């Protein structure tokens, strides 16, 4: 079997938007991996490792510089308030009595980042560039952007994971030590409010029957917050199971594009919308962001959420426009095996492609002639 050059592992794909040239775009990132399911998986895992490394390292750094007699928000700490809100390290009177749990959580994130980083490196340099060409179970996880069934399967697993994590937060609040209650200034377990009229009323701007323009961010008690997470977790588990077992209906899938850039635009739109919503929670919801930890004035932190949300929505429009102009995705076709010398089977080499940072397709290096003029 012929060897594949290192550059060919990052070869340009068939599903890049029309008019796009990697040679002319210095900011091109993972779009060069759009047709390489194995390489894109490696980038995805490595990205998760970077996020875990950031969270772990910043947590350990904040523990090292924490001053007990000064509130979190006056020290400019960003992650310890979140851990304190979850009830870690807080005494009966609502003050921080132990920072060791914060240190342990930071170290666990660093260990997790090392594992994820190793996985990202494996899939980048050792694993198959395209999962369909790998051995063992790798082909089972290959996907094409035009294969709506496989994409629905991937979405379903993501929803299942989110649902499990959401219900884990509920279990922490109900059984595993409780969470911090800003109204009482203590940590205690919470019994969720499961009244659907109360919980879903927030979606339409009603706080227990009274209209409030702040909508969901007007929630002012922990039972409603935990009850809302119960419903969200259950809905995500149902949605995840649904998407794993089904594929998009023709009438529902028709208005949508399923190219890589289109799915990126959908993700950016969802995260951007959540960024705008979270800004209202940061600014106005003391039950979710206790002023004892985050400060009574949180407009600056909320402004950061608004700015990031708007930037992500702009990215959504940008990538959605490019996806609409790019046409339908091209399905993956595995290379056809060819019969070589002595009846041995070899895989046909990949066609010449434009590599990142190169202006033209790179020709094959000339073969050196050996003894008697043989190649």
From Swiss-Prot:
<keyword id="KW-0812">Transmembrane</keyword>
<keyword id="KW-0472">Membrane</keyword>
<dbReference type="InterPro" id="IPR000932">
    <property type="entry name" value="PS_antenna-like"/>
</dbReference>
<comment type="subunit">
    <text>The antenna complex consists of chlorophylls (a and b) and chlorophyll a/b binding proteins.</text>
</comment>
<feature type="transmembrane region" description="Helical">
    <location>
        <begin position="102"/>
        <end position="122"/>
    </location>
</feature>
<dbReference type="GO" id="GO:0009767">
    <property type="term" value="P:photosynthetic electron transport chain"/>
</dbReference>
<dbReference type="GO" id="GO:0016168">
    <property type="term" value="F:chlorophyll binding"/>
</dbReference>
<dbReference type="GO" id="GO:0009523">
    <property type="term" value="C:photosystem II"/>
</dbReference>
<feature type="transmembrane region" description="Helical">
    <location>
        <begin position="300"/>
        <end position="320"/>
    </location>
</feature>
<feature type="transmembrane region" description="Helical">
    <location>
        <begin position="40"/>
        <end position="60"/>
    </location>
</feature>
<keyword id="KW-0148">Chlorophyll</keyword>
<keyword id="KW-0793">Thylakoid</keyword>
<feature type="region of interest" description="Disordered">
    <location>
        <begin position="352"/>
        <end position="375"/>
    </location>
</feature>
<dbReference type="GO" id="GO:0009522">
    <property type="term" value="C:photosystem I"/>
</dbReference>
<dbReference type="Pfam" id="PF00421">
    <property type="entry name" value="PSII"/>
</dbReference>
<dbReference type="InterPro" id="IPR036001">
    <property type="entry name" value="PS_II_antenna-like_sf"/>
</dbReference>
<comment type="function">
    <text>The antenna complex functions as a light receptor, it captures and delivers excitation energy to photosystems II and I. The Prochlorales pcb genes are not related to higher plant LHCs.</text>
</comment>
<feature type="transmembrane region" description="Helical">
    <location>
        <begin position="262"/>
        <end position="282"/>
    </location>
</feature>
<feature type="transmembrane region" description="Helical">
    <location>
        <begin position="225"/>
        <end position="245"/>
    </location>
</feature>
<keyword id="KW-1133">Transmembrane helix</keyword>
<dbReference type="GO" id="GO:0031676">
    <property type="term" value="C:plasma membrane-derived thylakoid membrane"/>
</dbReference>
<comment type="similarity">
    <text>Belongs to the PsbB/PsbC family. IsiA/Pcb subfamily.</text>
</comment>
<keyword id="KW-0602">Photosynthesis</keyword>
<feature type="transmembrane region" description="Helical">
    <location>
        <begin position="151"/>
        <end position="171"/>
    </location>
</feature>
<keyword id="KW-0603">Photosystem I</keyword>
<keyword id="KW-0157">Chromophore</keyword>
<protein>
    <recommendedName>
        <fullName>Chlorophyll a/b light-harvesting protein PcbC</fullName>
    </recommendedName>
</protein>
<keyword id="KW-0604">Photosystem II</keyword>
């Amino acid at each position: 079997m012929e060897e594949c050059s290192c550059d060919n592992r990052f070869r340009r794909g068939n599903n890049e938007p029309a008019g796009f040239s990697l040679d002319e775009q210095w900011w091109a990132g993972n779009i060069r991996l759009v047709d390489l399911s194995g390489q894109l998986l490696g980038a995805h895992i490595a990205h998760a490792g970077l996020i875990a490394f950031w969270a772990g390292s910043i947590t350990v750094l904040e523990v090292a510089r924490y001053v007990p007699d000064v509130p979190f928000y006056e020290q400019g700490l960003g992650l310890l308030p979140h851990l304190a809100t979850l009830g870690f390290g807080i005494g009966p009177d609502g003050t921080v009595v132990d920072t060791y749990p914060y240190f342990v959580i930071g170290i666990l994130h660093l260990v997790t980042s090392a594992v994820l980083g190793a996985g990202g490196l494996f899939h980048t340099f050792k694993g198959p560039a395209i999962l369909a060409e790998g051995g063992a179970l790798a082909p089972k996880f290959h996907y094409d952007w035009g294969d709506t069934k496989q994409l629905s399967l991937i979405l379903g697993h993501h929803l299942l994971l989110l649902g499990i994590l959401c219900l884990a937060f509920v279990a922490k609040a109900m059984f595993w030590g409780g969470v911090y209650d800003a109204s009482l200034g203590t940590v205690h377990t919470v019994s969720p409010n499961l009244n659907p009229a109360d919980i879903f009323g927030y979606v339409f701007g009603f706080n227990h029957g009274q209209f409030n323009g702040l909508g969901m961010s007007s929630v002012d008690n922990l039972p409603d917050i935990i009850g809302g997470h119960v419903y969200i977790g259950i809905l995500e588990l149902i949605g995840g199971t649904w998407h794993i077992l089904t594929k998009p209906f023709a009438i529902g899938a028709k208005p949508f594009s399923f190219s890589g850039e289109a799915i990126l635009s959908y993700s950016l739109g969802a995260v951007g919308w959540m960024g705008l919503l979270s800004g209202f929670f940061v600014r106005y919801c003391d039950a979710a962001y206790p002023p004892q930890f985050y400060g009574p004035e949180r407009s600056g932190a909320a402004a950061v959420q608004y700015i990031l949300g708007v930037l992500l929505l702009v990215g959504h429009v940008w990538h959605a426009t490019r996806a609409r102009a790019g046409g339908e995705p091209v399905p993956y076709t595995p290379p056809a095996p060819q019969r070589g010398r002595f009846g041995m089977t070899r895989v046909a080499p990949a066609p010449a492609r434009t590599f990142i940072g190169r202006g033209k397709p790179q020709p094959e290096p000339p073969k050196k002639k050996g003894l008697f003029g043989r190649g």
